[in-house]
Amino acid sequence: MQFSKMHGLGNDFMVIDGVTQNVYLTEDMIRKLADRHYGVGFDQLLLVEPPYDPELDFHYRIFNADGSEVAQCGNGARCFARFVSLKGLINRSDMYVSTAKGKMVLTLVDEENVRVNMGEPIWEPAKIPFIANKFEKNYILRTDLQTVLCGVVSMGNPHCVLQVDDIEQATVHQLGALLEKHHRFPERANVGFMQIIDRHHIKLRVFERGVGETKACGSGACAAVAVGIMQGVLDANVQVSLPGGTLQIEWQGKGKPLYMTGTATHIYDGFIKL
């Protein structure tokens, strides 16, 4: 099976063309491939499939390192766009793809950057899913470690976002693990720790569902900015500094799609026998 290794700001992926080759993967196979000592090693595996809808170009599937399938990965979407272009699966800069929970528009901006229309942030608790009687800008969540005030949103996957005073001192691993599996998130959650520098700039660390902390999380950056704008502490165009690099997020508010722009890097091509 042929594959490519790619990364978006250090969030690394094994990307597989399921259009020109037959691909069958089990959870156990994905876990073995994800092993950084005995396999290929990655945060997520991305699978390019033929479109389910004839009006679209591709179907985009994402699997975490633990083998679980998820509906969204923003950094992966940028790498997905770069991959299908590099492999000659498409010959235009705009592409239309479906995911498990919706549709996306991906645009190759230049040789480095990809712009992703992430769609509208989802705030309705039942659709996130998140257990709450109604939408609130802030929710109180209690854990064994501490009680936190957070925003909750879906960018195609559930996100919990909390503000911290110092990103370096944030208890990302301990608190992130507790909030990821909090009982109010039936499908678990990605947990973002956001330090606001000013209304146009934040620092962010993300504990990803099924993965742990990664160098960068595109949907997490989108979620953090959406929450910050909804809470009135950020403006419409925000630079997000992650451990792996920088993303630019734009959102004009409710009823409008959110856009993410950032790099997508091809590392190498490989072949592996399954």
Curated annotation (Swiss-Prot):
**So where's the catalytic machinery, residue-wise?**
73 (proton donor), 217 (proton acceptor)
Could you tell me the keywords of this UniProt record?
Amino-acid biosynthesis, Cytoplasm, Isomerase, Lysine biosynthesis
Q: Where is this site: Important for dimerization?
A: 268
> Which reaction does this enzyme catalyse, per its entry?
(2S,6S)-2,6-diaminopimelate = meso-2,6-diaminopimelate
- Record's keyword annotation contains Manganese: no
Q: Its pathway?
A: Amino-acid biosynthesis; L-lysine biosynthesis via DAP pathway; DL-2,6-diaminopimelate from LL-2,6-diaminopimelate: step 1/1
Known EC number:
5.1.1.7
Site-annotated residues for Could be important to modulate the pK values of the two catalytic cysteine residues: 159, 208
Query: Where along the sequence do coiled-coil regions lie?
Result: none
Q: What class of enzyme is it?
A: isomerase
Residues the record lists as binding substrate: 11, 44, 64, 74-75, 157, 190, 208-209, 218-219
One molecular function GO term is: diaminopimelate epimerase activity
What GO biological process terms are annotated to this protein in UniProt?
lysine biosynthetic process via diaminopimelate
* This protein's GO CC annotations: cytosol
UniProt subcellular location: Cytoplasm
**Quaternary structure annotation from Swiss-Prot or TrEMBL:** Homodimer.
Family assignment from sequence similarity: Belongs to the diaminopimelate epimerase family.
As for what it does, the entry says: Catalyzes the stereoinversion of LL-2,6-diaminopimelate (L,L-DAP) to meso-diaminopimelate (meso-DAP), a precursor of L-lysine and an essential component of the bacterial peptidoglycan.
What is this protein's record name? Diaminopimelate epimerase
**Organism this protein belongs to:** Haemophilus ducreyi (strain 35000HP / ATCC 700724)
Gene encoding this polypeptide?
Answer: dapF
